[in-house]
């Protein structure tokens, strides 16, 4: 029984491996990571800035998917993926019961990117690998 628990703990530790890319010694805004199929890579983005992911020169992006597509622009170009947070429009619908019956009122509003609501995942599939990312919006002063 102890062997089964130990094996399960070891397997779970690989599932939650988060790879925080190392920053360049020349410019802290540039970061890099070595691919490991068992890692989730963290990307910290800022509002008003474009981030770029560069994959191997022999890789081509086949597909991208994110859990919050309304809040992120993803632009693919060969082995490059450009990422930018964006505001999105949504509607608030309220139903009211009055003496006459039910009525609905809706109001459209824009939700600006913010660190609390803009956390999601990103999956990139290339012709060679599948990458999984944690996509986070960080404060401007980070």
Over which residues does each language-model region extend?
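A general "mature secreted/periplasmic domain" signal
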Residues: 18-142
């Amino acid at each position: 029984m102890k062997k089964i628990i130990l094996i399960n703990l070891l397997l779970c530790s690989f599932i939650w491996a988060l790879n925080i890319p190392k920053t360049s010694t020349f410019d802290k805004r540039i970061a890099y990571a070595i691919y490991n199929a068992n890692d989730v890579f963290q990307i910290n983005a800022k509002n008003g800035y474009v981030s770029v992911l560069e994959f191997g020169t022999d890789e081509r992006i086949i597909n991208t998917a994110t859990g919050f597509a309304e809040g992120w622009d993803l632009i693919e170009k060969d082995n490059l993926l450009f990422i930018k947070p964006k505001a999105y429009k949504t509607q608030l619908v309220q139903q009211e019961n009055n003496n006459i019956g039910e009525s609905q009122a809706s109001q459209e509003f824009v939700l600006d990117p913010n660190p609390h609501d803009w956390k999601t995942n990103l999956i990139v599939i290339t012709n060679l690998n599948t990458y999984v990312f944690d996509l986070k919006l960080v404060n401007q002063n980070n």
